[in-house]
């Protein structure tokens, strides 16, 4: 197997950049992609993001979560450093938990057009309650549409032990 050629990495500008700028305001333009070299195969790419923060739109108080992103790529894949910076850009963004997870998923669909994607936010309790929004998408008219329906119906069938994180 050979490594990636320089021209395959033209759109990847943040990885390896020592002068990284952290944006504190929501910015989907930070996201970068590269080509999937294994388009003939279905496989999951999973990201665990344990330090996600956003703001409550009513009180301005911070909300903390672990965000799980899993997707089956088609042609394009999200570059991980750009994803990290994108998620960091939610730091001063005020939205409800459910909205934030759907915004993330919609931005990634627009960026990559994956075969399948799911985004799950596990927020720490605030006011005595934790909220864990789950959202997913399967490309319409394909087996991934049925997969999304199945995973939606079964995603929390055997929930983990809640330990107040």
Curated annotation (Swiss-Prot):
NCBIfam families for the chain: QueF-II
Keywords noted in UniProt: Cytoplasm, NADP, Oxidoreductase, Queuosine biosynthesis
Enzyme Commission numbers on file: 1.7.1.13
Known catalytic reactions: 7-aminomethyl-7-carbaguanine + 2 NADP(+) = 7-cyano-7-deazaguanine + 2 NADPH + 3 H(+)
Main location: cytoplasm
Regions that span the bilayer: none
Name of the protein this chain belongs to: NADPH-dependent 7-cyano-7-deazaguanine reductase
Database matches in InterPro entries: GTP-CH-I_C/QueF, NADPH_dep_7-cyano-7-deazaG_red, QueF, QueF_type1
Keyword Chloroplast: no
Binding positions for substrate per the UniProt entry: 78-80, 97-98
HAMAP family on file: QueF_type1
Enzyme class (EC, first level): oxidoreductase
GO biological process: one example: queuosine biosynthetic process
């Amino acid at each position: 197997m050979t490594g990636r050629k320089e021209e395959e990495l033209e759109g990847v500008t943040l990885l390896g950049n020592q002068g990284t700028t952290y944006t504190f305001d929501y910015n989907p333009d930070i996201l970068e992609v590269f080509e999937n070299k294994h388009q003939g195969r279905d496989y999951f790419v999973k990201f665990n993001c344990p330090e996600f923060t956003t703001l409550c739109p009513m009180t301005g108080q911070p909300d903390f979560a672990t965000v799980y992103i899993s997707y089956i790529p088609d042609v394009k894949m999200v570059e991980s450093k750009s994803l990290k910076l994108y998620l960091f850009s939610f730091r001063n963004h005020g939205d409800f938990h459910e909205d934030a997870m759907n915004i993330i998923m919609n931005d990634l669909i627009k960026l990559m057009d994956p075969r399948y994607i799911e985004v799950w936010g596990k927020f720490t309790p605030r006011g005595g309650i934790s909220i864990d929004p789950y959202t997913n998408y399967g490309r319409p008219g394909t087996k991934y549409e049925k997969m999304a329906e199945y995973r939606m119906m079964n995603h929390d069938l055997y929930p983990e032990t809640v330990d107040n994180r």
